[in-house]
Amino acid sequence: MTRKQRRLTMIGGSLVVLAIAAALVLNALRDSIVFFSTPVMVSEHHIQPGQRFRLGGLVQNGSLVRGDNLVVTFKVSDGSATLPVTYKGILPDLFREGQGVVAEGALDSSGVFRADTVLAKHDETYMPKEVADALKKQGHWKDDYGPQAGAVEASGKQGVSQ
């Protein structure tokens, strides 16, 4: 084998190893690439109970029920499908029916999503109340800043028990 053939063999072998490594990494990260799954995606992919993922959609109107010990149940909808959610903890300030939400947790054996983290989504015009008040006090407030809103992450790591 000549020197040129050995060099080409080494380059070709290195490219094959690199391609295999890239395929393995992409396969391992396949489920993490999507920030959240919608209720339709959950039903189409038949996610196994206990598998952690993020669920996103709108809190369905009329579905919010506050129980004892900070337990809250609601339904997340994407317009086509709906998934029941149970969460134990303090909800974000912006959490309300009809508002966008991303919850992290897992499905239980009965098909209820048990969330341990809930994020309320907001639009790009968000401004914390404290900042808006400070701007108004200093005379720098502009009416085109939009409505005052806030998004706060709530994490109830103690879990949900029923």
UniProtKB/Swiss-Prot annotation:
Residues 29-162 are periplasmic. Residues 1-7 are cytoplasmic. Keywords: Cell inner membrane, Cell membrane, Cytochrome c-type biogenesis, Heme, Iron, Membrane, Metal-binding, Signal-anchor, Transmembrane, Transmembrane helix. GO terms for cellular component: plasma membrane. Coiled coil: none annotated. GO terms for molecular function: heme binding; metal ion binding. Heme binds at H122, Y126. Belongs to the CcmE/CycJ family. HAMAP family: CcmE. This is Cytochrome c-type biogenesis protein CcmE. It comes from Nitrobacter hamburgensis (strain DSM 10229 / NCIMB 13809 / X14). The gene is ccmE.
